[in-house]
Amino acid sequence: MTLKLLKKKLYTALSLLACCLTVFSVKGQANANNAITVAEANITAQSDVISEDQVIAVVLLAGGKLTVKSTSSVFSHNLAGQPSLSLGTLRIKGKNIGSTALSAQTEVPLSPLEQTIGTGGAVLATISVDYRVPTGGTIWLAGTYTANVNYNVANFTPFYMTVPAYITATSVVPASAPITINSFGQFRSVAGASSNNISLGYNTTVPTVIDLKAKTSSTFTFTPGFTSSLTFTPVSSSVLKATLSDPTGPVGSPITLSTTDKSLTPPAGLPVILTNKRPSLNTVFNIAGADLLANFVNAGIYKLPVTYTIAKTPAFNIAATSKTMDSSVDVTVANMMDISLPTTTIALNFTSQSNYSSGVTAAVTDQVMLSSTVPYNITVKAGTSAFVNASDATATIPLNVMTIEGMSGQSGITPIQLSTSPQTIITNGNPVIDRKLNLQYRIPSAKVLSAIFGKSPGNYNATIIYTIVAP
């Protein structure tokens, strides 16, 4: 009898204990579904991140309703000093209790205020919710954002929103950035010559710097546009300047190219912007007029391979894979020639006895101005058959009375006697910009006596033509 009574008491005690456990299990343990990844694809498309049917607890829904609030004020970034996100960035909606949909499902933005997101019966079961994160209108920084999410059935302290670190190019730099030199005015100008804008576009969740360098060599390679035995001096990459700009103007300071990476961006880099897209960044390459004049006189193609690197700023302490892109700056100097005569009227006057006895000379400083990007010859000829008296066309003086030669100190000029046939005064001159020739026109005394003395008084005129031609 005593043994049976003890068994009954033990059974009763066990039943009461089980009942107590059921009654007091009102708030359960938080499930592991306490994180959302805001993927690159969503940020790029500016589409919502959806995470459905996330179990938050296995519990009896006390009072028949599911509520949520946050004991945090913001979603804080894991790196100190970085901007936070508002709690409302995360949207939450009650979903199911067990296999049954919650009633009165309501999506709410997370806030410090307790809000009902669904109702249901007092059944011991899994409770699930849907999460939604709109990506539009938010600047997403790589890293982890945390805030407390407090349900009346479970706590997520903290809840995580993770943003991957990425730099993804959205445009491909062209194989070459052409700079075309097809005018002597470019050599004479201060500005020189520039490339068209080279567009850079990329998406990113990290602050970025854009570096540029000469890829493999500190000098341009050169392919001449003419056949010559000339020795060409290599042109340094340092004559090439690059500037980064956006639609509002320059983004950083100009850099000179070398084989060392130099930043096109300000020291602090470029911040992540709304939409996380960096379009409309343009690189302009420039060579100043003085550098063109000193280094790019020879016609041909000057080529400098370059490398762009887009990387995270050193101060942003989350790793991101850098993006490199190769291009080439191609400077094409056209085959060009030009010749001009600043002084177009030359007078040799026979007004005294000594003019007839000693001859006459007219010296003209800067008589010829010439430019050529290829080797050249300069020829001279008369455009008329003789010097003709302006008052009497039958009165003439032979062309060959006149010698054209360089003034004292002027080198490289071959003297000629004027005729109607082209005669070369400069042979195979090297490419040059704005070379000035100091010439003199001379009628020696011997020619005066043989061809001029005794002629009718008056002005005798002839046209003289200077021509620049390829050798």
Regions found by a protein language model. Give the residues of each.
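N-terminal small/polar-rich segments of proteins
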Residues: 26-84, 114-239, 271, 279-399, ...
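Intrinsically disordered, low-complexity sequence elements enriched in Ser/Thr/Gly/Pro
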Residues: 5-7, 25, 89, 276, ...
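Bacterial N-terminal signal peptides that target proteins for export
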Residues: 2-14
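A surface/secretory-pathway sequence property marking extracellular, secreted
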Residues: 78-108, 225-263, 389-416
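Helix-centric, low-specificity signal for extended rod-like, repetitive segments
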Residues: 1-2, 20
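Extracellular adhesion/glycan-binding regions together with long Ser/Thr-
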Residues: 97-125, 250-280, 412-436
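Bacterial N-terminal signal peptides
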Residues: 14-22
